[in-house]
Amino acid sequence: VTTTTVRQVIETPRRPDRTAPRETRLRALDGLRLVAALMVAAYHYGGRGGEVTTAWGSSPKDQFPTLSGYFAYGCLGVQVFFVISGFVICMSGWGRPLKSFFASRASRLLPAYWVAVVLVTAVFALPMVAFKAVAPSDALVNMTMLQQPLGVDRVLGVCWTLWAEVRFYALFALCVVLPGASRRRVIMFCAGWTLAAAIAQASREPLLDIVLMPEYASFFIGGVGLYLVHRDRRDVYAWGIVAVSFLIGQHYAVRSLWNAADPNAFAHRTTLGIVLVVAFGFLAVTAIALGWLNWANWRWLTVAGALTYPFYLVHEHLGWVVIHGLHIGLGLPSAETFALTVTSMLLLAWLMNRYVEKPLTPKLRSALAKAR
């Protein structure tokens, strides 16, 4: 008689990779979104030249002789946004079917975007506004979010970043969401995109550059890697993705934003300053991913996060109009004008969130999710 000894191995139950974990609201991430948006606003109002000079009546360097040099780093808020986006998109796409993912993203982006395009077009058409009116045909094309690849003038100055976001969503949807998210698949996606983006940069092929976005890919990829860290802080591959993404990301940021000290340049951004701001973005999302900021659980941070997207859409061009009215029209000092402009744009963002996003987003999401 042959006896077989059966050994019972007690294993800790493991959740399948394709199942989305129950996520608590990361309110610190909402707060970081608003910080990034305010960084970009500081850049648009006081950290650059161009059309904002018309709003102030002179260069922002004259309005903010001390702060303008710091405001010039605010453009890196976009890179911080991209890291946040990588984290959030991986989190929201995990365990979701493609239709649900598409419905979620479209309903999140489009209602406020459409209203922002209409608002800016209408305001710039007013005869008392000092800025160039938008052609009706261009405004209509802008409603599709495809104005940049179609070579049409942008209604919203910041919408170039949305074109980058849309391409990231498409890549993530095709490579991860459609076949089903898993740790292995996400790691392969990050590694493959990193390598492909490097090849695109070396090849200088315009089509590859459009699809793979070598200048911005590492920020999205870094955010995706940080979501893997959030799921398992001991994941060595995830930490490797984050480290490589930071190293590549800071390179592209320095290459595109550094300029030598030149009295004719608006501001001199140093290599160290650029790297530090990029590091801030990665470290802030890392702290959130590791749970170090879970104590920041105030409800107002959720409100701040809700205001970020509409604020980001309208703050630049409508902000110029407000600056011109307050500073040139009413003669208010620069500091008061700056503060009141930011406040008025936040108020407009609240109105858009309350009367546009809250009623329309769930309806659009439901309609898209039910459609065949």
Give the label of every model feature segment.
Residues 48-76, 98, 103, 108-170, ...:
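Membrane-interface helix-loop-helix regions
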